[in-house]
UniProtKB/Swiss-Prot annotation:
Keyword terms: Cleavage on pair of basic residues, Coiled coil, Disulfide bond, Fusion of virus membrane with host cell membrane, Fusion of virus membrane with host membrane, Glycoprotein, Host cell membrane, Host membrane, Host-virus interaction, Lipoprotein, Membrane, Palmitate, Transmembrane, Transmembrane helix, Viral attachment to host cell, Viral envelope protein, Viral penetration into host cytoplasm, Virion, Virus entry into host cell
Cytoplasmic side: 251-257
UniProt cross-references to SUPFAM superfamilies, sorted A to Z: Virus ectodomain
Protein name: Envelope glycoprotein
Lipid attachment points (S-palmitoyl cysteine): C245
CDD domains hit by this protein: RSV-like_HR1-HR2
Protein's UniProt keywords contain Lipoprotein: yes
Residue ranges that the UniProt entry lists as topological domain Extracellular: 1-229
Note: This protein is synthesized as a Env-Ryk chimeric protein and then cellular protease cleaves this precursor into gp85 and the putative oncogene termed gp69 (gp37-Ryk). The sequence shown here corresponds to the Env (gp85-gp37) homolog fragment of the chimera.
Pfam families: Avian_gp85 (PF03708), TLV_coat (PF00429)
Species of the source: Avian retrovirus RPL30
Coiled coil location: 112-162, 180-210
Amino acid sequence: FPILPGVWVDSTQGNFTKPKALPPAIFLICGDRAWQGIPSRPVGGPCYLGKLTMLAPNHTDIHKILANSSQTGVRHFRSVSHLDDTCSDEVQLWGPTARIFASILAPGVAAAQALREIERLACWSVKQANLTTSLLGDLLDDVTSIRHAVLQNRAAIDFLLLAHGHGCKDIAGMCCFNLSDHSEAIQKKFQLMKEHVNKIGVDSDPIGSWLRGLFGGIGEWAIHLLKGLLLGLVVILLLVVCLPCLLQFVSSSTRKM
């Protein structure tokens, strides 16, 4: 009988032929059952022809899958962008003499210099944290591969001992074997480091962030409307403040003429 992809098979109906063999590594999969050939009375569905493999993820892979699944559907209300690799991390601090003269003669320049150096320090911290996390991740991968190789070697040694009729008691120290696994704790610390790095960001829209925090979960169209109203209000206030001075200046100029 023909096996169509995705069909359900009912062995209580129809005529069935003899079991058929499938090529190596090919299985008939019907629901939660799998056969290395086509049986005379398969049950279940949907049925497919495919290959089977063993899934044995470690703690690192499981945490990556959970992290990717938890990030879906997350809404960001604040317009805070994270620092990228293109930011400048060249920190050049002023000496005491330059700070004193700048504070006395040009306070605005001193404040701008301080803000710029703070931004560069934040960029330097983010890059260092990213490098540290990447380095520790590579070391964890190496340790995981070494652990896997050690377990394979131990299994081969046990097999050879049993094949020659010996046990672990014949060789000192072979009966006790403890290989600790701290990958789960290390992965948690990696996640904490990434969370701390993500706390450093640049607020590209402070007015919008302030309005979102003031009015709660309002829509973006309302944010743009409120920003337009605030801009119009600021322009009106500037006109109210500056227009009398401008009119007075024009009138005094005309009188002198």
